[in-house]
UniProtKB/Swiss-Prot annotation:
Binds to 23S rRNA. Forms part of two intersubunit bridges in the 70S ribosome. One of its GO terms (molecular function) is structural constituent of ribosome. It comes from the Bacteria. Part of the 50S ribosomal subunit. Forms a cluster with proteins L3 and L19. In the 70S ribosome, L14 and L19 interact and together make contacts with the 16S rRNA in bridges B5 and B8. The keyword rRNA-binding applies. This is Large ribosomal subunit protein uL14. GO terms for biological process: translation.
C-alpha cells in the first residue's frame, strides 16, 4: 500500500534510484495505491549519467509492494521492497531493462511492455 510521502525503489535502468510519491492518480479522494497503479513522484536520488535528474517529477507504475496482494484464488503474495518503474505519457517504460520480479497484476492492468521486459512474472 503506497500513499503520499512513501519512498519507492526504482527497478529499471532509467537513471533514478529512489523516488518519493506525492500524488496517487485516480480520483481526488484516492489515498492508497497498490500494484499496477500509477502515481506521480519526485526523483530523490539518481545516477549522474542517467536520463532523469534529482528533483524531476515523473509518473511511475508500482510493480512490487511490501503489503500483501490478495488474489482471487485465495493466495497472498508480498515482496521485500516497494518498487516501481518510470513510465512516459503513453504508459511505456523509460528504461530498457527491469530488475527483479514483477507481480502478475501489472500485466492484467495492460502494462504489457513492462511485464515482457521483466525477468520473472509472479
Amino acid at each position: 500500500m503506497i500513499q503520499q510521502e512513501s519512498e519507492l525503489e526504482v527497478a529499471d535502468n532509467s537513471g533514478a534510484k529512489r523516488v518519493k510519491c506525492f500524488k496517487v492518480l485516480g480520483g481526488s479522494k484516492r489515498r492508497y495505491a497498490h500494484v499496477g497503479d500509477i502515481v506521480v513522484a519526485s526523483v530523490q536520488d539518481a545516477h549522474p549519467e542517467g536520463s532523469v535528474k534529482k528533483g524531476d517529477v515523473v509518473k511511475v507504475v508500482i510493480i512490487r509492494t511490501k503489503s500483501y496482494i490478495k488474489r482471487k484464488d485465495g493466495t497472498k503474495i508480498r515482496f521485500d521492497t516497494n518498487s516501481c518503474v518510470l513510465i512516459d505519457d503513453k504508459k511505456n517504460p523509460k528504461g530498457t531493462r527491469i530488475f527483479g520480479p514483477v507481480a502478475r497484476e501489472v500485466r492484467d492492468r495492460d502494462f504489457l511492455k513492462i511485464s515482457s521486459l521483466a525477468p520473472e512474472v509472479i
